[in-house]
């Protein structure tokens, strides 16, 4: 029997959680299916080269290369084209809010099953109001297990529409490198302590947390401090206090080398918790309270149960003091020993099996266009009455302009996008981050697929109309 193709789509969320889960599922699928990952997250650049999984990057609407409505159509057409090219019968989506383009692709394709990989521990944000409608558009919903699920009191906690699995993680005991092997790969001294720090930078409050955390490491003899990117603010100023030996390393997946570290300081995202704790790394969690993920609840559970230390993310002094506790060898030993009690994160393999079984089943029932349009209306309402009023005024303006048209005096071609099927991080990163539009193709794309993709790009970008004279002749 030919291996079925399964598409794993992810949003461009905060951090790498969505992409890490998709990668873990894809690795488990490789044995008996052909997984393809599509994502709006820039981190997808790392996957093809290091995991041997075919991928496509899709520019998100945050790039502002087209209107929101046009981007929804663009995403739908991109996904449908990929389904037609690969013969995929199942597509999963890992993200808080399934984009209208994702659901429209499902509604438009008679044989495509749509699975929502819906993480729990939501904060009570406006997204919860469309949860019911979104769920009804799915053929199947999977909830990746969370160590801290007992502290989940968010909008998904009481729902009965999802299949709960074990937690999903790229860290697996059997494939992770030993301490010395990992240190050799990263170029670290075998005989000096090493701490991994994974906190974001950007806005001033986030930068202050980074500085506070690094300050807690001062005085640790012979310490190697490992970051995944330079600790700089937007003006290029260092956020690190003097006196630390800081090294920046890039390695994907980082889960493979976590045994290199004596301790860690990390945000309390799904990815960090379900990689660091199974790797038995003593950790201080400093929550990022933005986004939908309830990181504070997860951090509190880890702290209360004795698996990690929680720093008060709103108190810089507490962050420094809590991180300083990691310098105590007894504290580190206690945390590491406690983490050994956690169950193995086998959810990637469990979800892979669910997706495979759906792929070999009869075709799913398609949700109705009526239900889809209900969801679109509810989405606009949830964005606020001001947005609804704006949409109404915009429609009226379009009607008025149809009756009283401008004189168009200049039509210019948009700059053509860069096309390519690059599959190394070195090639992909600058293209994904660049200002010129980038249209990424899966490796081995057919001529028909390339032709269809160019039609989609033309419809999305097309021509730019410049109006000089707004009066009728």
Predicted regions and their residues:
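Conserved nucleotide-sugar phosphate-binding/catalytic loop shared by glycosyltransferases and other
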Residues: 2-14, 28-78
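A short, glycine/small-residue-rich beta-strand->loop->alpha-helix junction that serves as a flexible
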Residues: 9-21, 204-206, 416-421
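Short N-terminal targeting/anchoring amphipathic segment
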Residues: 80-98, 441-443
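A nucleotide-sugar donor-handling region in carbohydrate enzymes
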Residues: 119, 123-126, 134-201
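Donor-nucleotide binding loops and adjacent catalytic segments primarily
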Residues: 179-263
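A donor-sugar binding/catalytic signature common to diverse glycosyltransferases
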Residues: 251-297
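C-terminal "capping" alpha-helix adjacent to the active site of nucleotide-linked donor transferases
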Residues: 305-310, 314-331
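C-terminal amphipathic helix plus adjacent low-complexity
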Residues: 327-402
């Amino acid at each position: 029997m030919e291996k079925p193709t399964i598409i794993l789509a992810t949003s461009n969320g905060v951090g790498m959680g969505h992409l890490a889960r998709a990668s873990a599922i894809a690795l488990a699928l490789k044995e008996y299916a052909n997984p393809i990952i599509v994502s709006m997250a820039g981190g997808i650049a790392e996957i093809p080269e290091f995991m041997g999984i075919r991928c496509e990057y899709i520019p998100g609407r945050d790039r502002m290369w087209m209107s929101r409505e046009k981007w929804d159509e663009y995403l739908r057409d991109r996904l449908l084209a990929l389904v037609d090219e690969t013969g995929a019968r199942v597509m999963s989506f890992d993200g808080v809010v399934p984009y209208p383009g994702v659901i429209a692709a499902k509604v438009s394709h008679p044989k495509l099953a749509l699975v929502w990989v819906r993480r729990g521990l939501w904060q009570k944000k406006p997204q919860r109001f469309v949860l019911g409608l979104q769920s009804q558009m799915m053929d199947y919903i999977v909830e990746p297990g969370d160590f801290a699920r007992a502290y989940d009191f968010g909008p998904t906690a009481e729902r009965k529409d999802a299949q709960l699995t074990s937690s999903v993680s790229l860290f697996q005991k059997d494939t992770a490198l030993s301490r010395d092997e990992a240190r050799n790969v990263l170029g670290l001294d075998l005989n000096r302590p090493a701490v991994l720090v994974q906190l974001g930078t950007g806005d001033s409050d986030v930068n202050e947390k980074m500085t506070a955390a690094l300050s807690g490491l001062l005085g640790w003899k012979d310490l190697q401090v490992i970051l995944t990117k330079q600790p700089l603010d937007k003006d290029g100023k260092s956020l690190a206090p003097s006196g630390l030996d800081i090294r920046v390393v890039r390695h994907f997946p980082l889960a493979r080398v976590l045994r290199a570290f004596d301790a860690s300081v990390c945000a309390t995202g799904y990815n960090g918790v379900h990689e660091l704790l199974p790797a038995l790394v003593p950790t201080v969690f400093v929550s990022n309270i933005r986004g939908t993920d309830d990181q504070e609840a997860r951090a509190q559970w880890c702290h209360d149960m004795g698996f990690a230390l929680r720093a008060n993310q709103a108190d810089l002094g507490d962050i420094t003091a809590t991180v300083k506790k990691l310098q105590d060898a007894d504290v580190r030993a206690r945390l590491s020993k406690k983490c050994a009690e956690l169950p193995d994160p086998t959810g990637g393999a469990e979800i892979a099996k669910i997706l495979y079984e759906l792929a070999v089943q009869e075709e799913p029932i398609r949700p109705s266009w009526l239900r889809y349009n209900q969801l679109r209306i509810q989405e606009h309402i949830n964005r606020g009455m001001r947005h609804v009023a704006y949409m109404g005024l915009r429609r009226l303006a379009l009607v008025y302009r149809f009756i009283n048209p401008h004189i168009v005096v200049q039509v210019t071609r948009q700059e053509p996008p860069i096309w390519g099927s690059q599959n190394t991080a070195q090639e992909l990163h600058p293209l994904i981050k660049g200002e010129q539009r980038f249209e990424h193709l899966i490796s081995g794309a057919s001529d028909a697929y390339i032709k269809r993709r160019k039609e989609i790009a033309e419809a999305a970008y097309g021509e730019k109309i410049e109006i000089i004279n707004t009066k009728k002749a």
